[in-house]
From Swiss-Prot:
EC number(s) per entry: 5.3.1.24
Bilayer-spanning residue ranges: none
Gene this protein is translated from: trpF
CDD domains: PRAI
First-tier enzyme category under EC: isomerase
One biological process term in Gene Ontology: L-tryptophan biosynthetic process
Molecular function GO terms recorded: phosphoribosylanthranilate isomerase activity
Family named by the database record: Belongs to the TrpF family.
Record keywords: Amino-acid biosynthesis, Aromatic amino acid biosynthesis, Isomerase, Tryptophan biosynthesis
Matching InterPro entries: Aldolase_TIM, PRAI_dom, RibuloseP-bd_barrel, TrpF_fam
Protein name, per record: N-(5'-phosphoribosyl)anthranilate isomerase
Amino acid sequence: MKPDVKICGLKTEEAVEKAVSLGATHVGFIFFEKSPRHIEPDIAGRIAEKARGRAKIVAVTVDADTDDLDDIVYLLKPDILQLHGHESPQQVLTIKALYGLPVMKVFSIREPADLLQIDAYIGIADRFLLDAKAPEGSDLPGGNGVTFDWRLLRDLDAEVDYMLSGGLNKDNVGQALAETAARGLDVSSGVESAPGVKDLERMDQFFAAVRLATATAPVSGSVQ
């Protein structure tokens, strides 16, 4: 089966419609003011209607407090909460109970030890997203356009359901699928002409590359 594909950091109706029409299974909206992809919850809620019922709507937060989460959930009505901060297993459980939504927990990877933290969240988070650790000095936990060594994932338990993120683009996504057991792909900067500006042609190219890769080397997919 084809992998899930999530286009993250969407800010316009045009980009949302394009993502869904190309076959995106997930569309992500980022609520983190330091990011060039940050969007206000009310605006996100309006443009997300283009995707509702056609793709999973994902709210991406970074150590958000309850008041902010309340606003995001109320205005966006997401299908999934993506936690990109330092949320503990107990915090993940609390958030799931509070909002009744599945959680995708993000981990930043650079070296083998970074994968060890996943164990504490198995059976708690509904899915994982494995991203490249941010470069030194970056204010952004993700969306930095850098990859990590995918060979690190070879020893990951095959039962771990994860999306692969970090520097994916049309030129490397085939290699990413060949080298990992990722059941999903998350792309943001790789389909942009500038930080926060989605490029419709690059989105076309990315999906074409995914189709080409999966036609020759199918992977198992999993839609949350």
